Amino acid sequence: MQISIIVPTFNEARCLSETLTQIQQLSPHQLIVSDGGSNDNTIEIAKNFTEFVIKGPSGRAPQMNAGAQIATGNIFLFLHADSRIEPASYKKMLHSMKNPEKIGGAFSLCIDSEKWSLKLITRLANIRSKYLGMAYGDQAFF
């Protein structure tokens, strides 16, 4: 199984290095950063981690599509630049995708905050995802 991780970016210099460092620890087949017109150091930071840095139209969906067009893996994982995936969760995804009946999925949402409102949003998003099969765009999905 070859995983292409696609990270759409727009002015993500403040958090990108940490995210890409964590992604490298997962040892994906390919890491693609698809930028939507950043005017900070996002592109320079991304080039320190991968040769696959593309500049495309702004907007999350067009950036994700641009990344998917050059992806060579047989599974595409879309992850926001300010997000993380636990190695154990990544391994569960790999195991799950060995089942030929599985066509994709999403990770649970976890917002690192003590605010009750964000905890509520997290809980409701995960309930919606689990029971209705509808993930939010902020969840990593594959």
How would you label these PLM feature ranges?
Residues 29, 43-70:
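Conserved donor nucleotide-binding strand/loop of the catalytic core
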Residues 11-25:
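Short, well-formed alpha-helical segments that are part of the catalytic scaffolds
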Residues 76:
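Short aromatic/hydrophobic "clamp" motif used to bind/position activated sugar donors
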Residues 134-142:
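Short glycine- and hydrophobic/aromatic-rich loop-to-beta-strand nucleating segment
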Residues 7-8, 24, 28-37, 54:
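Short beta-strand/loop segment that forms part of the nucleotide-sugar
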Residues 14-18, 40-49:
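Acidic helix N-cap motif at the loop->helix transition within catalytic regions
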Residues 35-43, 83:
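A conserved acidic beta->alpha catalytic loop
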Residues 88-117:
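Conserved donor NDP-sugar-binding/catalytic core segment of glycosyltransferases
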